[in-house]
UniProtKB/Swiss-Prot annotation:
Beta-methyllanthionine (Thr-Cys) crosslink residues: T33-C38, T42-C50
Protein source organism: Streptococcus pyogenes serotype M49
PTM section of the record: Maturation of lantibiotics involves the enzymatic conversion of Thr, and Ser into dehydrated AA and the formation of thioether bonds with cysteine. This is followed by membrane translocation and cleavage of the modified precursor.
GO MF terms held by the record: signaling receptor binding
Lineage: Bacteria, Bacillati, Bacillota, Bacilli, Lactobacillales
Record keywords: Antibiotic, Antimicrobial, Bacteriocin, Lantibiotic, Secreted, Thioether bond
Stated name of the protein: Lantibiotic streptococcin A-M49
Its biological purpose: Lanthionine-containing peptide antibiotic (lantibiotic) active on certain Gram-positive bacteria. The bactericidal activity of lantibiotics is based on depolarization of energized bacterial cytoplasmic membranes, initiated by the formation of aqueous transmembrane pores.
A UniProt-annotated Pfam family: L_biotic_typeA
Remarks, miscellaneous: There are two genes coding for lantibiotic streptococcin A-M49, their coding sequences only differ in the propeptide region.
Residues where 2,3-didehydrobutyrine is found: T48
Compartment(s) of residence: Secreted; Cell surface
Chief subcellular location: secreted
BP GO terms, sorted: defense response to bacterium; killing of cells of another organism
Amino acid sequence: MTKEHEIINSIQEVSLEELDQIIGAGKNGVFKTISHECHLNTWAFLATCCS
């Protein structure tokens, strides 16, 4: 079996609910991440504080 077939078979094993979560089409169209509820300034400070 080629890699393409393996990839297609792997995708077919994912349920529609799991796919919705992966692509961010869940409840509100938002996939929650660690930075979802944080302000950009907080992350900018953390990224530049030690440079």
